[in-house]
């Protein structure tokens, strides 16, 4: 047979739940996806832990998922790598960490540690922060301040108070200078008015004054504000003055290892003046845990990413195949940068289509998001029948899953079921093969045992369907098996770098 043009649809956050009330997918009307189980070869994929290069049992996420899918192998992740480095103390030998410490010591400057404080393991891990506090203390730095971003998204919405209490036990002489919800400090959608609240807190100490941080967090909870949305809180001394703000010439380490959500705060602190928002850069000795953006000037990086060679996109380029990457804003970096193994620029023959995500405060307010527009855009492309490979992401089950709003999650799932149907029908008419998968679960586990909303990802298996592929059998696997499977359908030789298995036969 001649290789087939193939569409990969990633249903972001669509896992196999336990079919109880907590499983919003099971309680949604998903007639189309239900029909796929009956009519096409299907299997299950593992998306978490050691199956995607994370520590055992650690839930997967979109960045890790798309990296593994595009690479066609297990890609060992920063979380696992940095965990080991903290355990064996090899992090202490990292050149740019030593440089940051030496700068603070020699110039008698404050060292500010900024980032997400939780055990979510998606963007950061609190253990890495504890280690930095310990090493700064050993280095003899006297002025060490933590600016904590609270989570409530990759872990329970009211877990932040407990994480701050744990941090207070692991400061090694450092002090917590401020607290702010990730909604403001870790925006990634150019909502600069949100970022400004975090910027003003960090640089000017503008926020609610507090001498008891856990009490202030509890007050937020009492007012119906959960971790993600906690308004800026500044720690003050007995004279009501901030104990620390980030000043010109200070040292800053941003300890998030995931690259996307501390880009904006780093940009306004170090790269780009934004006079319209009253945000100007400071002259800082600024260090990040990983490389957030290779275009940054004067930002030091502790761990640079290894280049991933021979990703699916690169192999298609080598074989003169055309490809489309399409998603709405929220998942656009995932189908481009991450799917291409951390590469920003397009491959030859690659077309990128981004549909703007709706400008709403949270996606439970518009659970269909921009899926209908994404659908219309890609259907028009499939009807031309010209493109050899398409990677398409539907964001809804994940992004609405993070809100914890049950009815909205059901609407999101039903939207994606309907949109997937339209894409598949258009593709099959033009003889496309389809692989339909998820990168991790979320909407399949939305209520905790105690009845509270679960807004984090799940470690459930996810579905994988093969439509019109020319193969009738498919076996269970992992995300790193998808690229070799697609190359098999397209009759393109799999490079030896792709150690994933071919799931169809």
Question: What is the role of each PLM region?
Answer:
Residues 1-505:
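Feature captures the catalytic ectodomains and active-site-proximal regions of enzymes
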């Amino acid at each position: 047979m001649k290789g087939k043009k193939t569409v990969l649809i990633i249903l972001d956050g669509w896992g196999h739940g336990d079919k109880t009330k907590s499983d919003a997918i099971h309680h949604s009307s998903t007639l189309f996806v239900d029909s796929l189980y009956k009519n096409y070869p299907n299997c299950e994929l593992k998306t978490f832990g050691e199956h995607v290069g994370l520590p055992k049992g650690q839930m997967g996420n979109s960045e890790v998922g798309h990296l593994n899918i595009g690479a066609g192998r297990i890609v060992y992740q920063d979380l696992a790598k940095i965990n080991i480095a903290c355990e064996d103390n090899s992090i202490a030998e990292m050149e740019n960490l030593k440089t940051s410490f030496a700068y603070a010591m020699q110039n008698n400057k404050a060292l500010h540690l900024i980032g997400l404080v939780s055990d979510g393991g998606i963007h950061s891990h609190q253990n890495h922060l504890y280690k930095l506090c310990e090493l700064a203390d050993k280095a003899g730095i006297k002025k060490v301040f933590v600016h904590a971003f609270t989570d409530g998204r990759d872990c329970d919405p009211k877990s932040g108070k407990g994480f701050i209490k744990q941090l207070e036990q692991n400061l090694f002489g450092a002090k917590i200078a401020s607290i702010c919800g990730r909604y403001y400090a870790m925006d990634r959608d150019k909502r600069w008015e949100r970022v400004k609240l975090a910027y003003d807190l960090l640089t000017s100490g503008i926020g609610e004054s507090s001498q008891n941080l856990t009490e202030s967090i509890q007050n937020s909870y009492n007012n119906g504000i959960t971790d993600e949305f906690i308004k800026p809180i500044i720690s003050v001394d007995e004279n009501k003055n901030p104990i620390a703000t980030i000043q010109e010439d200070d040292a800053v380490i941003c300890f998030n290892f995931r690259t996307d959500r501390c880009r904006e705060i780093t940009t306004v602190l170090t790269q780009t003046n934004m006079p319209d928002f009253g945000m100007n850069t400071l002259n800082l000795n600024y260090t990040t845990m990983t490389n957030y953006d290779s275009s940054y000037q004067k930002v030091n990086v502790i761990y640079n990413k290894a280049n991933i060679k021979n990703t699916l996109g690169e192999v298609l380029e080598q074989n003169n195949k055309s490809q489309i990457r399409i998603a709405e804003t929220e998942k656009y970096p995932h189908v481009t940068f991450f799917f291409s193994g951390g590469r920003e620029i397009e491959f030859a023959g690659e077309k990128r289509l981004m549909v703007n995500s709706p400008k709403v405060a949270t996606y439970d307010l518009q659970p269909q998001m921009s899926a209908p527009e994404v659908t219309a855009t890609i259907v028009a492309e499939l009807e031309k029948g010209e493109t050899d490979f398409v990677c398409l992401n539907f964001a809804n089950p994940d992004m609405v899953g993070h809100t914890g709003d049950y009815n909205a999650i059901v609407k999101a799932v039903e939207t994606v079921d309907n949109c997937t149907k339209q894409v598949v029908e258009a593709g099959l008419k033009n003889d496309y093969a389809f692989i339909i998968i998820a990168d991790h679960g979320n909407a399949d586990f939305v209520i905790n045992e105690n009845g509270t909303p679960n807004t984090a990802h799940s470690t459930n298996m996810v579905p994988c369907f093969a439509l019109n592929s020319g193969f009738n059998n498919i076996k269970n696997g992992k995300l790193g098996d998808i690229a070799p499977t697609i190359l098999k359908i397209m009759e393109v030789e799999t490079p030896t770098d792709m150690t994933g298995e071919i799931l169809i036969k």
